[in-house]
Amino acid sequence: MFKLRIYKLSGAYKGNLDHEEFFSTREEMETRYNELFVYENYSLNPTAWENVGGQWKRLEEF
């Protein structure tokens, strides 16, 4: 299982977690990540995670 953590892009809570989206395959997650990614947003872009052994591990290449 994979997930994207989506962050608020503006307002008083800018940079805080907005919501998470879950995916059964890495390919689905990558497709959605590419839809959301904006180079100019830098650290506000989504972060990608994989569930390994019941714990979430961040995927560094995203």
Where are these regions (language model features)?
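Short aromatic-glycine-(Arg/Gly/Cys) micro-motifs in beta-strand/loop hairpins
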Residues: 1-17
